[in-house]
Swiss-Prot record:
Catalytic activity: beta-D-fructose 1,6-bisphosphate + H2O = beta-D-fructose 6-phosphate + phosphate
Reported pH dependence: Optimum pH is 9.0. Is active over a pH range from 7 to 9.
Protein name, entry field: Fructose-1,6-bisphosphatase class 2
Enzyme class of the recorded protein, top EC level: hydrolase
Cofactor entry: Mn(2+); Mg(2+)
Chain residues that bind Mn(2+) 2: 113, 116, 242
Domain of life of the organism encoding this protein: Bacteria
Residues annotated for substrate binding in this entry: 116-118, 148, 193-195, 215-217, 239
Annotated organism of origin: Mycobacterium tuberculosis (strain ATCC 25618 / H37Rv)
S-S bridge residues: none
Keywords: Acetylation, Carbohydrate metabolism, Cytoplasm, Gluconeogenesis, Hydrolase, Manganese, Metal-binding
Phenotype caused by lack of the gene: Cells lacking this gene are shown to be highly attenuated in a mouse tuberculosis model. However, another study shows that in a mouse model of M.tuberculosis infection, cells lacking this gene are able to replicate and persist in lungs similar to the wild-type strain. The mutant cells grow on gluconeogenic carbon sources and have detectable FBPase activity, due to the alternative FBPase (Gpm2, Rv3214).
Length: 362
């Protein structure tokens, strides 16, 4: 009706004419969990932030687990932990197989590492992060058979030349060519472990530079995929759970990771073979996380190449997070300001701040 109460106007009639109807979207946008999920890693980082440099890995990790477990049950999803703190008998919370979320929303695989780099956190060193990944139910690789895998990761521009079965020297040269760099311009990120002595020797023989990290190869893999990070390639053996979480991030960024399972001993090798795993198979990014709707969130605990750590001010703190979604390709960097006195009024998590001080607005 028009404002005067008479019949339909010409414009109103036209709006109902099928020839004037806008083409509908192919599908309604599904619920974007990213902003809900980042609250979980923020909570983990803020809880662990109180333990930085105190020499207690278990204390810091436990605080992060408690905080994340409390927050994750407010997230609109029906999640199952596929990568968590271990088996139920050894992990009271966030154990493998635990159901998480508020019971509404999509069915999801949930992978979490409350602190990637517990040693880094306990010593106050750089690059400790709180991290999680979510994907469609049944799309994450089962990491239970073999604890370690050999990995190589690179960003989108060189994803098509990666070959974990080739010598590292060939991979370095191939990536350098695609990126229009000299081999001597390349930087390879490697975990500083005795098992990597030959790998380090081979990389040095090419003339490429090396960045050795003591822990935290999830952050290292992400750095290899981000432009202007100073890292061009990640290589070496690290944890299988961390490899799957890194693959979720890499799916969102369009990079590539390849991996092969690396049993520690004959017993683990037999376990993997009996479970039907092919130890010679090259696992691609899509093999590790096959879903089309993947979310990844990380919040810095200590300062690092990727994220700033938790910073405390009178009455509050700041957190720095990265949030990614594969379906949209969106990568968000979020700097959040938290007034701890306000949080403690309603939160079951004790973030313990000076409630009498002035809140630091941005």
């Amino acid at each position: 009706m028009t404002a005067e109460g008479s019949g339909s106007s010409t414009a109103a009639v036209a709006s109902h004419d099928p020839s004037h109807t806008r083409p509908s979207r192919r599908e309604a946008p599904d619920r974007n969990l990213a902003m809900e999920l980042v609250r979980v890693t923020e909570a983990g980082a803020m809880a662990a932030g109180r333990w930085v440099g105190r020499g207690d890995k278990e204390g810091g990790d436990g605080a992060a687990v408690d905080a994340m477990r409390e927050l994750v049950n407010s997230v609109s999803m029906r999640g199952v932990v596929v990568i968590g703190e271990g088996e139920k008998d050894h992990a009271p919370m966030l154990y493998n197989g635990e159901e998480v979320g508020n019971g509404d929303g999509p069915e999801c695989d949930f992978a979490v590492d409350p602190i990637d780099g517990t040693t880094l956190m306990s010593k106050g060193m750089t690059n400790a992060i709180s991290v999680l990944a979510v994907a469609d139910r049944g799309t994450m690789f089962d990491p239970s058979a073999v604890f370690y895998m050999n990995k190589i990761a690179v960003g989108p521009d060189a994803a098509h030349v990666l070959d974990i079965t080739a010598p590292i020297s060939e991979n370095i040269r191939a990536v350098a060519k695609v990126k229009d760099l000299s081999v001597r311009d390349m930087t390879v990120c490697i975990l500083d472990r005795p098992r990597h002595a030959q790998l380090i020797h081979d990389v040095r023989a090419t003339g490429a530079r090396i960045r050795l990290i003591t822990d935290g190869d999830v952050a290292g893999a992400i750095s290899a995929c981000r432009p202007h990070s100073g890292t061009d390639l990640l290589a070496g053996i690290g944890g299988t759970p961390e490899g799957i979480i890194a693959a979720a991030a890499i799916r969102c960024m369009g990079g590539a990771i390849q991996a092969q399972l690396a049993p520690r001993d004959d017993a683990e090798r037999r376990k993997a073979l009996e479970a039907g795993y092919d130890l010679n198979q090259v696992l691609t990014t899509e093999d590790l996380v096959s879903g089309e709707n993947v979310f990844f969130c990380a919040t810095g605990v200590t300062d690092g190449d990727l994220l700033k750590g938790v910073r405390y001010y009178p009455g509050g703190c700041t957190t720095h997070s990265i949030v990614m979604r594969s379906k949209s390709g969106t990568v968000r960097m979020i700097e959040a300001y938290h007034r701890l006195s306000k949080l403690n009024e309603y939160s079951a998590i004790d973030f313990t701040g000076d409630s009498s001080a002035v809140y630091p607005l941005p």
